[in-house]
A protein has these predicted regions:
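Structural signature for extended repeat/solenoid scaffolds and their inter-repeat hinge/linker regions
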Residues: 1-249
Length: 249
Protein backbone atom coordinates (compact mmCIF):
# COMPACT_ATOMS: atom_id res chain seq x y z
CA UNK A 1 0.00 0.00 0.00
CA UNK A 2 1.11 3.53 -0.62
CA UNK A 3 -0.13 7.07 -1.03
CA UNK A 4 -3.71 8.15 -0.42
CA UNK A 5 -5.11 4.64 -0.04
CA UNK A 6 -2.58 3.86 2.68
CA UNK A 7 -3.44 7.13 4.47
CA UNK A 8 -7.12 6.20 4.43
CA UNK A 9 -6.54 2.68 5.76
CA UNK A 10 -4.28 3.99 8.53
CA UNK A 11 -6.91 6.59 9.43
CA UNK A 12 -9.53 3.89 9.90
CA UNK A 13 -7.32 2.19 12.49
CA UNK A 14 -7.44 5.12 14.90
CA UNK A 15 -10.13 6.35 17.25
CA UNK A 16 -11.49 9.77 16.33
CA UNK A 17 -9.42 11.68 18.90
CA UNK A 18 -6.27 9.73 17.96
CA UNK A 19 -6.88 10.48 14.30
CA UNK A 20 -7.48 14.16 15.04
CA UNK A 21 -4.27 14.37 17.08
CA UNK A 22 -2.34 12.72 14.23
CA UNK A 23 -3.82 15.12 11.67
CA UNK A 24 -2.95 18.15 13.80
CA UNK A 25 0.61 16.95 14.27
CA UNK A 26 1.07 16.32 10.54
CA UNK A 27 -0.44 19.73 9.74
CA UNK A 28 2.19 21.52 11.84
CA UNK A 29 5.18 19.17 11.75
CA UNK A 30 5.82 19.39 8.02
CA UNK A 31 7.32 22.41 6.30
CA UNK A 32 4.61 25.03 6.24
CA UNK A 33 1.57 24.78 8.48
CA UNK A 34 -1.70 23.57 6.96
CA UNK A 35 -4.04 26.13 8.51
CA UNK A 36 -7.06 24.50 6.89
CA UNK A 37 -6.60 21.36 8.96
CA UNK A 38 -6.26 23.38 12.17
CA UNK A 39 -9.47 25.25 11.39
CA UNK A 40 -11.39 22.15 10.39
CA UNK A 41 -10.57 20.26 13.59
CA UNK A 42 -10.23 22.92 16.29
CA UNK A 43 -13.33 24.86 15.20
CA UNK A 44 -15.62 21.82 15.08
CA UNK A 45 -14.71 19.62 18.03
CA UNK A 46 -16.41 19.84 21.42
CA UNK A 47 -14.52 20.95 24.55
CA UNK A 48 -14.49 17.33 25.73
CA UNK A 49 -13.06 16.15 22.41
CA UNK A 50 -10.41 18.88 22.42
CA UNK A 51 -9.40 17.95 25.95
CA UNK A 52 -8.94 14.33 24.87
CA UNK A 53 -7.06 15.39 21.73
CA UNK A 54 -4.63 17.41 23.85
CA UNK A 55 -4.04 14.41 26.09
CA UNK A 56 -3.39 12.10 23.13
CA UNK A 57 -1.14 14.71 21.50
CA UNK A 58 0.97 14.93 24.66
CA UNK A 59 1.15 11.15 25.00
CA UNK A 60 1.95 10.35 21.37
CA UNK A 61 4.12 13.29 20.36
CA UNK A 62 5.48 14.47 23.73
CA UNK A 63 4.32 17.99 22.98
CA UNK A 64 1.81 20.36 24.51
CA UNK A 65 -0.72 21.03 21.75
CA UNK A 66 -1.39 24.63 22.78
CA UNK A 67 2.31 25.50 22.86
CA UNK A 68 2.83 23.75 19.54
CA UNK A 69 0.00 25.75 17.94
CA UNK A 70 1.50 28.94 19.40
CA UNK A 71 4.86 28.12 17.83
CA UNK A 72 3.44 27.31 14.40
CA UNK A 73 0.84 30.07 13.92
CA UNK A 74 0.81 33.83 14.36
CA UNK A 75 -1.26 36.93 14.89
CA UNK A 76 -4.92 36.95 15.77
CA UNK A 77 -5.38 33.55 14.14
CA UNK A 78 -3.10 32.12 16.82
CA UNK A 79 -4.98 33.93 19.59
CA UNK A 80 -8.33 32.50 18.52
CA UNK A 81 -7.01 28.94 18.16
CA UNK A 82 -5.38 29.09 21.59
CA UNK A 83 -8.54 30.53 23.15
CA UNK A 84 -10.60 27.65 21.76
CA UNK A 85 -8.02 25.08 22.89
CA UNK A 86 -8.32 26.41 26.45
CA UNK A 87 -11.64 24.50 26.34
CA UNK A 88 -13.68 27.18 28.07
CA UNK A 89 -16.60 26.84 25.64
CA UNK A 90 -19.92 25.85 27.14
CA UNK A 91 -21.15 22.45 26.03
CA UNK A 92 -24.53 22.12 24.35
CA UNK A 93 -26.23 21.10 27.59
CA UNK A 94 -25.48 24.52 29.04
CA UNK A 95 -28.71 26.55 29.38
CA UNK A 96 -29.10 29.33 26.83
CA UNK A 97 -29.65 32.73 28.45
CA UNK A 98 -31.61 34.79 25.93
CA UNK A 99 -30.70 38.10 27.55
CA UNK A 100 -26.98 37.37 27.49
CA UNK A 101 -27.17 36.23 23.87
CA UNK A 102 -29.01 39.42 22.93
CA UNK A 103 -26.39 41.55 24.66
CA UNK A 104 -23.55 39.66 23.01
CA UNK A 105 -25.14 40.05 19.58
CA UNK A 106 -25.13 43.81 20.22
CA UNK A 107 -21.49 43.61 21.34
CA UNK A 108 -20.52 41.82 18.13
CA UNK A 109 -22.27 44.47 16.07
CA UNK A 110 -20.67 47.29 18.05
CA UNK A 111 -17.27 45.62 17.69
CA UNK A 112 -17.63 45.07 13.96
CA UNK A 113 -20.10 46.65 11.58
CA UNK A 114 -21.09 49.33 14.09
CA UNK A 115 -17.67 50.99 14.28
CA UNK A 116 -14.66 52.05 12.26
CA UNK A 117 -12.27 49.12 12.47
CA UNK A 118 -12.97 45.79 14.12
CA UNK A 119 -12.64 44.82 17.78
CA UNK A 120 -11.22 41.35 17.25
CA UNK A 121 -11.04 40.74 21.00
CA UNK A 122 -14.81 40.73 21.54
CA UNK A 123 -15.29 38.30 18.64
CA UNK A 124 -12.65 35.99 20.10
CA UNK A 125 -14.11 36.16 23.60
CA UNK A 126 -17.61 35.21 22.44
CA UNK A 127 -16.67 32.69 19.76
CA UNK A 128 -14.29 30.82 22.07
CA UNK A 129 -16.64 30.62 25.06
CA UNK A 130 -20.18 30.01 23.78
CA UNK A 131 -21.80 26.70 22.90
CA UNK A 132 -23.21 25.95 19.47
CA UNK A 133 -26.72 26.56 20.79
CA UNK A 134 -25.69 29.92 22.24
CA UNK A 135 -23.93 30.92 19.01
CA UNK A 136 -27.06 30.08 17.00
CA UNK A 137 -29.14 32.22 19.34
CA UNK A 138 -26.63 35.07 19.08
CA UNK A 139 -26.76 34.78 15.28
CA UNK A 140 -30.56 35.07 15.35
CA UNK A 141 -30.44 38.20 17.51
CA UNK A 142 -27.71 39.65 15.29
CA UNK A 143 -29.91 39.19 12.20
CA UNK A 144 -32.94 40.73 13.92
CA UNK A 145 -30.90 43.73 15.07
CA UNK A 146 -28.77 44.41 11.99
CA UNK A 147 -30.73 42.82 9.16
CA UNK A 148 -27.60 40.91 8.15
CA UNK A 149 -26.51 37.30 8.41
CA UNK A 150 -23.60 37.06 10.83
CA UNK A 151 -21.61 34.99 8.32
CA UNK A 152 -21.91 37.88 5.85
CA UNK A 153 -20.75 40.26 8.58
CA UNK A 154 -17.69 38.11 9.26
CA UNK A 155 -16.99 38.02 5.53
CA UNK A 156 -16.89 41.82 5.37
CA UNK A 157 -15.09 42.49 8.67
CA UNK A 158 -12.24 39.95 8.58
CA UNK A 159 -9.75 38.50 6.14
CA UNK A 160 -7.39 35.57 5.73
CA UNK A 161 -7.27 32.64 8.12
CA UNK A 162 -9.07 34.49 10.93
CA UNK A 163 -12.06 35.00 8.64
CA UNK A 164 -12.03 31.32 7.67
CA UNK A 165 -11.82 30.30 11.33
CA UNK A 166 -14.66 32.56 12.52
CA UNK A 167 -16.87 31.47 9.62
CA UNK A 168 -16.14 27.82 10.36
CA UNK A 169 -17.07 28.27 14.03
CA UNK A 170 -20.44 29.78 13.16
CA UNK A 171 -21.20 27.56 10.18
CA UNK A 172 -20.63 24.39 12.19
CA UNK A 173 -22.62 25.83 15.10
CA UNK A 174 -25.60 26.41 12.81
CA UNK A 175 -25.28 23.09 10.95
CA UNK A 176 -22.19 20.92 11.42
CA UNK A 177 -23.13 18.46 8.67
CA UNK A 178 -23.65 21.28 6.19
CA UNK A 179 -20.24 22.71 7.07
CA UNK A 180 -18.55 19.42 6.22
CA UNK A 181 -20.65 19.06 3.07
CA UNK A 182 -19.24 22.36 1.79
CA UNK A 183 -15.71 21.26 2.72
CA UNK A 184 -16.18 18.05 0.77
CA UNK A 185 -17.43 19.98 -2.25
CA UNK A 186 -14.23 22.03 -2.14
CA UNK A 187 -12.25 18.78 -2.01
CA UNK A 188 -14.16 17.33 -4.95
CA UNK A 189 -13.33 20.17 -7.31
CA UNK A 190 -12.65 18.54 -10.67
CA UNK A 191 -10.09 21.21 -11.48
CA UNK A 192 -7.95 20.45 -8.42
CA UNK A 193 -9.32 17.63 -6.26
CA UNK A 194 -7.90 17.44 -2.75
CA UNK A 195 -7.75 13.77 -1.83
CA UNK A 196 -6.16 14.49 1.56
CA UNK A 197 -9.18 16.59 2.50
CA UNK A 198 -11.58 13.93 1.22
CA UNK A 199 -9.84 11.26 3.28
CA UNK A 200 -9.68 13.46 6.36
CA UNK A 201 -13.37 14.33 6.38
CA UNK A 202 -14.82 11.00 5.28
CA UNK A 203 -12.72 9.04 7.77
CA UNK A 204 -13.18 11.42 10.71
CA UNK A 205 -16.95 11.75 10.22
CA UNK A 206 -17.65 8.13 9.25
CA UNK A 207 -18.85 7.23 12.75
CA UNK A 208 -20.28 10.64 13.59
CA UNK A 209 -22.61 12.27 11.06
CA UNK A 210 -21.72 11.03 7.58
CA UNK A 211 -25.36 10.18 6.80
CA UNK A 212 -26.38 13.77 7.56
CA UNK A 213 -23.43 15.11 5.57
CA UNK A 214 -24.52 13.09 2.52
CA UNK A 215 -28.03 14.52 2.80
CA UNK A 216 -26.76 18.09 3.17
CA UNK A 217 -24.49 17.55 0.17
CA UNK A 218 -27.40 16.45 -1.98
CA UNK A 219 -29.61 19.29 -0.72
CA UNK A 220 -26.96 21.86 -1.60
CA UNK A 221 -25.52 20.52 -4.84
CA UNK A 222 -28.25 18.22 -6.24
CA UNK A 223 -25.76 15.40 -6.71
CA UNK A 224 -24.93 12.45 -4.50
CA UNK A 225 -21.65 12.77 -2.62
CA UNK A 226 -20.62 9.27 -3.68
CA UNK A 227 -20.90 10.26 -7.36
CA UNK A 228 -18.62 13.26 -6.89
CA UNK A 229 -16.15 11.18 -4.89
CA UNK A 230 -15.99 8.54 -7.64
CA UNK A 231 -15.05 11.23 -10.15
CA UNK A 232 -12.29 12.68 -8.00
CA UNK A 233 -10.66 9.77 -6.17
CA UNK A 234 -8.39 8.87 -9.15
CA UNK A 235 -7.43 5.61 -7.44
CA UNK A 236 -9.58 2.52 -7.88
CA UNK A 237 -8.78 1.17 -4.42
CA UNK A 238 -9.39 4.50 -2.72
CA UNK A 239 -12.61 4.93 -4.71
CA UNK A 240 -13.84 1.50 -3.62
CA UNK A 241 -12.97 2.24 0.01
CA UNK A 242 -14.82 5.56 -0.08
CA UNK A 243 -17.84 3.93 -1.71
CA UNK A 244 -17.89 1.19 0.94
CA UNK A 245 -17.87 3.80 3.71
CA UNK A 246 -20.41 6.09 2.02
CA UNK A 247 -22.78 3.22 1.24
CA UNK A 248 -23.05 2.18 4.86
CA UNK A 249 -26.53 2.86 6.27
Amino acid sequence: MSGSFEDAIIGLMYSQVEYDARLLYKAMHRLGTDEGVLIEIIATRSPQQLTEIKQVFQREYKKDLIKYVESETSGHFKKVLVAILQCQRHDNNFPVDQNICNVEAQQLYAGGEGRWGTDEGIFTKIFASRSNMELCTIANYYQQMSGRNILDAIESEFSGDVKKLFKAIFHQAINTADYFATRLKEACSLGAPNRDKMIRIIISRSEVDLTQIKQCYFNRYKINLIDDVRKCAFDKYLSKLFCAILNRP
